[in-house]
Swiss-Prot record:
Name by which UniProt lists this protein: ORM1-like protein 1
Organism of provenance: Mus musculus (Mouse)
GN (gene name): Ormdl1
InterPro entries reported for this sequence: ORMDL
Localization: Endoplasmic reticulum membrane
Role summary: Plays an essential role in the homeostatic regulation of sphingolipid de novo biosynthesis by modulating the activity of the serine palmitoyltransferase (SPT) in response to ceramide levels. When complexed to SPT, the binding of ceramides to its N-terminus stabilizes a conformation that block SPT substrate entry, hence preventing SPT catalytic activity. Through this mechanism, maintains ceramide levels at sufficient concentrations for the production of complex sphingolipids, but which prevents the accumulation of ceramides to levels that trigger apoptosis.
Domain notes: Ceramides bind to ORMDL3 N-terminus and stabilize it in a conformation that physically restricts the accessibility of the substrates to their binding sites in the serine palmitoyltransferase (SPT) complex, hence inhibiting SPT catalytic activity. In the absence of ceramides, the N-terminus is flexible and permits substrate binding, thus liberating SPT from inhibition.
One Pfam assignment: ORMDL
Membrane topology: Multi-pass membrane protein
TM regions (residue ranges): 22-42, 47-67, 101-121, 124-140
Length: 153
């Protein structure tokens, strides 16, 4: 019997995306964002899809690739403070189910936005730039890499 021993992760950031119902909550949140944008009176369907895609990808970039460290006091002696949330996800192991889900979800949203905007050149360029801004940092070759020293500290 282990008295006084906590049964938790060393860094809770590593497993939070694997928790029960997280993927469903994520998908419902994106759907709710789209419904809210569609309810704006002057917002057309193509604009709503493009805004959904851009807001989703901006949020994903900020929360997964720009913010570093953990909101918890972890016993890992500060190893996680220089890592983004994406680099901490699943202890840095590549090609896990969570990483695949968070890589494929902006691609699916991009396909939906492109289809519903009827491949309009302006929307297509905005959606493509938004997609690339979240897919390039997810590449395994860029794990821990800081291009031009951006987000180094």
């Amino acid at each position: 019997m282990n008295v006084g021993v906590a049964h938790s992760e060393v860094n809770p950031n590593t497993r939070v995306m694997n928790s029960r119902g997280m993927w469903l909550t994520y998908a419902l949140g994106v759907g709710l964002l789209h419904i809210v944008l569609l309810s704006i009176p002057f917002c057309s369907v193509p604009v709503a899809w493009t805004l959904t895609n851009i807001i989703h990808n901006l949020g994903m970039y900020v929360f997964l690739h720009a913010v570093k460290g953990t909101p918890f006091e972890t016993p890992d002696q500060g190893r996680a403070r220089l890592l983004t949330h994406w680099e901490q996800l699943d202890y840095g192991v590549q090609f896990t189910s969570s990483r695949k889900f968070f890589t494929i979800s902006p691609i699916i949203l991009y396909f939906l936005a492109s289809f519903y905007t009827k491949y309009d050149p302006t929307h297509f360029i905005l959606n493509t730039a938004s997609l690339l801004s979240v897919l390039i940092p997810k590449m395994p070759q860029l794990h821990g890499v800081r291009i031009f020293g951006i987000n180094k500290y």
